[in-house]
Each structure stands twice: as structure tokens, then as C-alpha cells.
Amino acid sequence: MNVSRCRIIAVGKVRKGWVQEGVELYLKRLPGLTVVELKDSSREKEAEAIRAALRSDELPVMLMEQGTPLASIPFAQRLERLGNERLAFVIGGADGLTDELKAAARWQLSLSPMTFPHELARLLLLEQLFRAQAILQGSPYHRA
């Protein structure tokens, strides 16, 4: 897994200090990972901004409650199988993603069957990306 080939496209700012601390911690642990932060707006305007932010060479991974849930090891294995594919993990705003964006996803991922605020979803995704990297490198960080 090459995190420099991954981006997170997220609607909304991280407003809670404790969440921002966690985000900064994992971004330091994942050098090369980029976060593109988009402005909160209507769902349709957010979808337009997401489409504009996506690169043509990226595989869009939409984070959504109805997506496929994966435990940490299968998540790491899937990232490893994707090899050098460029990935864009997309986190929608408070109203979620449009049906059009969901349909355009090559991969629909669920972090949990529960719903989280978008800023918390960003932190959870960063931690899971770090954990996936640790699993693939044989690091003792993952102790399941």
C-alpha cells in the first residue's frame, strides 16, 4: 500500500479540537497522504465540488453507511491488492452523498453500520489507513 497514492476528499472542516489533534497525529504518521477539504453546502453543490476534485486517474472510494463493511485485516488486504492504483476516499457532508456519486463509486466502503459526523469519519478513516499500513508492514501496532 502506497499512501502517497491516496487522497481523502472530505466535505466540511474539522471543528472539534480533539478530533483535529487525532487527524494531525495520523497525517504525520502517513506522510504523502493528502486531504482535500471542501466547503459545506447543499448536497448537490457538494457533489459538484467532489466531482471537480476527483482526478480521472483515481479510483473513487465512497464512504457511506450502506457500503461494504470490512474488518481491519481484509481492508489492508484489499488496499494491498489495489497495488499502485490511485485512490480517492470521499467523505460527504452532513446530508451524505448524492445517488449519482454513490453510483459512480468503484468501491463503496462502510466504516460501521452506525452513522458518524463527517469529521469523526475522517479520523476513523485515517486511523484505519495507518492500521492497514502497519498490518502490511508487520508492525506490532495492530494487535487483534
UniProtKB/Swiss-Prot annotation:
It catalyses: pseudouridine(1915) in 23S rRNA + S-adenosyl-L-methionine = N(3)-methylpseudouridine(1915) in 23S rRNA + S-adenosyl-L-homocysteine + H(+). HAMAP family: 23SrRNA_methyltr_H (MF_00658). GO terms for cellular component: cytoplasm. The keyword Iron does not apply. The gene is rlmH. It comes from Synechococcus sp. (strain WH7803). Specifically methylates the pseudouridine at position 1915 (m3Psi1915) in 23S rRNA. Gene3D superfamilies: 3.40.1280.10. S-adenosyl-L-methionine binds at residues 92, 111-116. Belongs to the RNA methyltransferase RlmH family. This is Ribosomal RNA large subunit methyltransferase H. Keywords: Cytoplasm, Methyltransferase, rRNA processing, S-adenosyl-L-methionine, Transferase.
